[in-house]
Amino acid sequence: MQSGLMGELLELTLEHVGLVSVAMAIATAMAIPAGILLTRREALRRWVLGFANIMQTVPSLALFGFLIPLPFIGGIGKHTAIVALVLYALLPILQNTLAGIVGVDRAVRESAIAMGMTGRQLLWLVELPLAARTILAGVRVATVITIGTATIAAAIGGGGLGVFIFRGLASVDTKQILAGAVPAALIALAADKGLSWVEQKFWRG
């Protein structure tokens, strides 16, 4: 019985990490280019950031429920869970990408242009390297948020460690709740510390 529980814990932990990894990969691939675009199109900033802010204010369970009826997402299951997690992860990465690039010293930017750099070269060789630490900080925040929010995925059949939590709530079983909550918290802590280490390793001072 004990080995069966450990096996299920391992399976749900891997499932949880998988949900978070896919959602973060999609969110990062969307938010960084969008953040770059917003540095070039100021008129879009209010609308795009406004949408991302709205997604953050919607209660997580409500957002999961709202997405279920949408036919192009896929109803109950992992697809809907991933879409919801992506929407929650967008804002920190988007904001930090924008802040990082906009925050590049104007003198540095002007020097690069004076050297004959094109807009593309300026972005790839100057702005993104200087903004990378800020962008990574946004990814770190989004990752921790996503790990916690992913526990709600079990409510719509998305799996993950939330399965233990919801099962424990239904049966008033504290051990089941802790079996889901503690590993999720440890994963979030490990992700935060790991990304923080990367940040300090490559951008000391």
Region spans (language model):
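C-terminal transmembrane helix and the adjacent membrane-cytosol boundary/short C-terminal tail
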Residues: E42, L98-V102, R106, A114, ...
